[in-house]
Amino acid sequence: MTNGTVVRSMVLPDGYIIALDDGMISWRPSSGRRTNYRLQYPAAVLLGMMGPTGYCESVVIGDTRGNVIRLSLPRLELLDACETSGSVIRSICRVSNSSDRLLVGDDSGHVWLIGRDVPNNFLLLFKHDECITSIRTQDNEITIQSGWSKYHYDWEGVMKSNFDRNELFHQKQIERTNRRAKLLERKGSNSALVAMLDLPMIS
């Protein structure tokens, strides 16, 4: 029995998985007994891995210390574990439905490739300049989300395009500041004109 706080959860057709702030991972089936597995550090992200049967057969967990752990479902047996840079794992995606390779993005902007057929089981592909909040791959491109901003990289780490929302927000702020300055200037001019009209006439 654990009294930890739920920090992550994932709903599946046959039950749901919760991750607690004390590192506990719990599989809670719709019927049957619960299964628990305790990690050394709390989970930061969960990813369900569908197998050839069409069902979710394992769960990948990225924790707050840069570890990526894969557990079987429903028994929560340890299948793989990999330690990256020590930064919080923020996002994980599967390279393809037919591959067990994973793309992993962390709090420091590192992009990792993880898999049993990867040298040393993990490889640093490149480093993004900001915290990675979302990562996915499609059409030989890696798409990274950092907050509101989106970036497209090739697999060599060369940026192909980007849409930086921060620049847009900054531009909007400048436009608002300029509009406000013009309004204040206009108001000041009108006030001076009104003051002149209020002066007594000298004959």
Regions picked out by a protein language model, each given a short descriptive name:
Residues Y16-A19, V59-G62, L102-G105, I142-S146:
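Conserved beta-strand element within WD40/beta-propeller blades
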Residues M1, R33-L39, E77-C82, N120-F126, ...:
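A short beta-strand motif characteristic of beta-propeller blades
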Residues E130-T133, G147-S203:
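Terminal intrinsically disordered, low-complexity extensions flanking WD-repeat/beta-propeller proteins
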Residues P29-G32, L73-L76, R116-P119, E156:
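Short loop/turn segments that connect beta-strands within beta-propeller blades
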Residues P13, Y55-C56, S98-S99, D139-E141:
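Conserved loop/turn motif of beta-propeller repeat scaffolds
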Residues N3-M10, Y41-G51, S87-R94, E130-R136:
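Canonical WD40 repeat/beta-propeller blade segments in eukaryotic WD-repeat proteins
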Residues D22-I25, R65-V68, S108-V111, W148-Y151:
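Loop/turn residues immediately N-terminal
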Residues D80-R90, L103, H110-L113, N120, ...:
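Internal alpha-helical scaffold/solenoid segments in large eukaryotic proteins
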